[in-house]
């Protein structure tokens, strides 16, 4: 290989984060869908960020054909810097202004399946992490959150179903055998949560009433011929909606919630606001062919993507280094959901054992190898490689540590504060930790928060060594704990972790003994943390 043909690899560092120089308050998109040439009209309400020095507006793009750029309805000068569209002659001050961009793209040639693509007669999108820039020019970063309106136009016979995020405002026919559908998402979201689906699809529908008395429409869309395999998926979606409302007080916030299942989706599942897109593996099942594992996978993944509605969508990540903020928290929530759905204590235990077995098999080996990285990494070269067992599964165990330290009620108080304080914002793992501590100010977590947050910054699997001794004369038991953590790439010396430990003593007859701690507290379960 000729070394001159190698593209230099750039590294993005967490410490280099800077807030955007502009905010995009609202987005109005119009699509004229065509497999060979889709036309996209992008109207944005933009304003400068007063906290950042004045600079040009630099919009991300990739593989687009640019036709027109207007600012406040007038033509304007622009330049291209690589794939980026740069606008310099913009209104000054803090008043919002309108930017209108007209582009075209070729969905049928999009073999990367990022952005808008065409497969077997249908249009689909995949925008996380940086796919939206392949649809139109935009600030393709998670901390830019906007409200969205989307107008879809297409041939009615070939694409009778037109879906996007949020609530359906209106639909109707157009000349020449075309039709349209207009959608509105009133809740601010980043562009990675945008979704569009168009094609020949059929739906299983179910109307539900929330605890608050609001009616919602649940829909599971599939290709014709697969509708009879969607019954369990609909049951799982209904159970997810009911569970999140009962367990965490988090209700469905849109008039409808849609799932689209297609074999042409290579991301497993994606939590686009109100319009989840799944691979058929996690939706379709029939008793005659599906295994218990298939059913569990459907229930778990549908729960996971639905739970993102609040932990990931309504509150999202400031930057991609905070990915575990949404994924670790939501994996924890889907694990709790699966345990609650299991019913009996023994079935719950089986679920937990399965989770830990998977953690030991996949994440422990990742932590022990050359690719070891913290739950909140410090740098990356390719964002698509960021979706790891450490970020997801270990991240979920870090969230479980909060619940262990605070108890179920204390954790709920922390999550309630997190939702109320940060709804509609793009935040960090530190923000989540602070909410947990602020909601439980007298807790061990609050008193040692900086130590606890080492779980986010240090890689590796710590080892806990325990030794105990019983003094019959004084009827006292002493438990000594030591911890260690092996070196990992870039981290040779590890500071102690905050590790909650559940313990208890049993009498000869197997009954639990009360523990009289030296500090005077009497508890059935004690926590001890020490470093050595």
Regions found by a protein language model. Give the residues of each.
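N-terminal, polar/Ser/Thr-rich
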Residues: 1-39, 117-126, 138, 142, ...
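Intrinsic-disorder/low-complexity, polar/charged segments enriched in Ser/Thr/Lys/Arg/Asp/Glu/Gln
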Residues: 26-28, 37-43, 56, 84, ...
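Surface-exposed beta-strand/loop patches in extracellular or lumenal glycoproteins
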Residues: 41, 45-63, 137-140, 146-155, ...
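A surface-exposed beta-strand-loop module
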Residues: 49-119, 176-177, 532
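Aromatic/His-enriched, Gly/Pro-containing loop or helix-boundary segments
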Residues: 56, 73-93, 126-135, 223, ...
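Beta-strand-rich binding/interaction modules
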Residues: 65-71, 445-450, 461-532
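Extended, low-hydrophobicity, Ser/Thr/Pro/Gly-biased non-transmembrane segments
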Residues: 102-205
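Hydrophobic alpha-helical and helix-loop surface patches within well-folded domains
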Residues: 183, 214-469, 479
């Amino acid at each position: 290989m000729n070394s001159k043909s190698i593209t230099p690899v750039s590294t993005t560092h967490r410490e280099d984060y800077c807030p955007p120089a502009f905010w995009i308050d609202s987005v109005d998109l119009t699509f004229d869908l065509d497999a060979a040439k889709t036309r996209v009209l992008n109207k944005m309400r933009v304003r400068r960020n007063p906290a950042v020095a004045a600079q040009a507006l630099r919009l991300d793009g990739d593989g687009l054909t640019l036709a027109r750029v207007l600012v406040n309805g007038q033509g304007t000068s622009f330049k291209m810097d690589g794939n980026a569209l740069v606008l310099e002659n913009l209104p000054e001050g803090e008043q919002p202004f309108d930017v209108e961009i007209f582009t075209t793209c070729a969905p049928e040639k999009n073999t990367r399946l990022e952005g808008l693509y065409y497969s077997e007669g249908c249009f689909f999108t995949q925008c996380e992490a940086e796919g939206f820039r392949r649809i139109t020019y935009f600030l393709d970063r998670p901390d830019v959150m906007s409200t969205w309106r989307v107008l879809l136009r297409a041939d009615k016979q070939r694409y009778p179903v037109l879906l996007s995020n949020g609530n359906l405002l209106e639909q109707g026919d157009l000349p020449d055998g075309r039709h349209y559908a207009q959608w509105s998402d009133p809740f601010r979201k980043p562009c990675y949560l945008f979704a569009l689906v168009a094609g020949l699809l059929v739906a299983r529908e179910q109307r539900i009433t929330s605890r608050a008395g609001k009616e919602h429409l649940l829909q599971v869309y599939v290709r014709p011929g697969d509708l009879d395999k969607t019954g369990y998926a609909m049951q799982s979606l209904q159970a997810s909606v009911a569970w999140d409302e009962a367990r965490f007080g988090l209700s469905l916030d849109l008039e409808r919630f849609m799932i689209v299942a297609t074999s042409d989706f290579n991301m497993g599942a994606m939590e686009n606001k109100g319009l989840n897109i799944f691979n058929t593996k996690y939706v379709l099942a029939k008793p005659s062919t599906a295994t218990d594992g298939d059913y569990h996978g459907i229930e778990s993944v549908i729960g996971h993507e639905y739970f993102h509605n609040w932990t990931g969508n309504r509150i999202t990540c400031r930057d991609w280094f905070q990915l575990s903020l949404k994924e670790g928290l939501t994996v924890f929530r889907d694990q709790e959901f699966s345990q609650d759905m299991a019913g009996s204590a023994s079935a719950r235990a089986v679920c937990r054992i399965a989770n830990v077995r998977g953690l030991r098999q996949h994440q422990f080996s990742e932590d022990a190898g050359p690719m070891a990285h913290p739950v909140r990494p410090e740098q990356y070269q390719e964002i698509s490689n960021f979706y790891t067992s450490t970020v997801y599964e270990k991240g979920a165990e870090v969230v479980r540590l909060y619940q262990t330290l605070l108890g179920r009620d204390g954790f709920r108080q922390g999550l309630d504060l997190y939702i109320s304080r940060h709804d509609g914002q793009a935040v960090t793992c530190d923000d989540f930790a602070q909410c947990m501590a602020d909601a439980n100010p007298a807790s061990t977590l609050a008193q040692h928060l900086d130590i606890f947050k080492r779980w986010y910054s240090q890689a590796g699997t710590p080892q806990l060594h325990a030794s105990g001794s019983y003094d019959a004369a004084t009827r006292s038991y002493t438990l000594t704990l030591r911890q260690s953590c092996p070196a990992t790439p870039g981290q040779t010396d590890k500071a102690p972790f905050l590790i909650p430990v559940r313990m208890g003593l049993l009498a000869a007859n197997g009954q639990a003994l009360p523990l009289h701690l030296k500090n005077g507290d009497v508890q059935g379960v004690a926590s001890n943390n020490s470093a050595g």
